[in-house]
Amino acid sequence: MKGSPLFHGLAPEEVDLALSYFQRRLYPQGKPIFYQGDLGQALYLVASGKVRLFRTHLGGQERTLALLGPGELFGEMSLLDEGERSASAVAVEDTELLALFREDYLALIRRLPLVAHNLAALLARRLREADLELDLLSFEEARNRVAYALLKLLRQGLGPLFQIRHHELAALAGTSRETVSRVLHALAEEGVVRLGPGTVEVREAALLEEIAFGLA
């Protein structure tokens, strides 16, 4: 816990001082910590146990964002604004948290300004991670669209060997030529297709269909 990135660069006695601003909270297994849409009031540091962060979509489907253990932080945006929580948090097992409320945070950084720098560094790192995740999600979406375009051609009786250029397939899939090239090479490495000069051959039609509908 004292190795948390929030305390990076602090002397041991400064870490103890910082921890004195936190309030202890106990959550039994399965108890919600906060819900998506709640007004944020505190940052939480996991002292023991495990926490699941998840987002609920309009259809009620839950998507797990992270599983957090001792020494990890969540809810940090609430220290910077009074906006709504973007996700829900629940205790996966009996969990002890240390809560840092906004007023206590402001008092803490007056004593230990490095904590504010560490929080900014943590937010920057998470922003980079979010950007990377968006790139990965965009690639997965493009992968599905390219697979669906190939599946349509296959169902039209034009395959399994297609005479098609990357820019033509890009137009069918609604993506860029560069993205199509990346997706096709990934599918070739998986053995789903075989690539040749100006050709794409479907080798695993069943797997292609699963990819097209997001099942693989």
Curated annotation (Swiss-Prot):
Positions of the HTH crp-type domain: 140-206
GO MF terms held by the record: cAMP binding; DNA binding; DNA-binding transcription factor activity; protein homodimerization activity; sequence-specific DNA binding; transcription cis-regulatory region binding
GO (cellular component) term, any one: cytosol
Reported consequences of knocking out the gene: Decreased expression of genes downstream of the TTHB186, TTHB147 and TTHB159 genes. Decreased expression of TTHB178, TTHA0771 and TTHA0176 genes.
Cysteines engaged in disulfide bonds, as pairs: none
Its job: Activates transcription. Positively regulates six promoters upstream of the TTHB186, TTHB147, TTHB178, TTHB159, TTHA0771 and TTHA0176 genes in a cAMP-dependent manner. Regulated genes include clustered regularly interspaced short palindromic repeat (CRISPR) associated (Cas) genes, and the genes encoding a putative transcriptional regulator, a protein containing the exonuclease III-like domain of DNA polymerase, a GCN5-related acetyltransferase homolog, and some T.thermophilus-specific proteins of unknown function.
Name of the molecule in the record: Cyclic AMP receptor protein
Organism per entry: Thermus thermophilus (strain ATCC 27634 / DSM 579 / HB8)
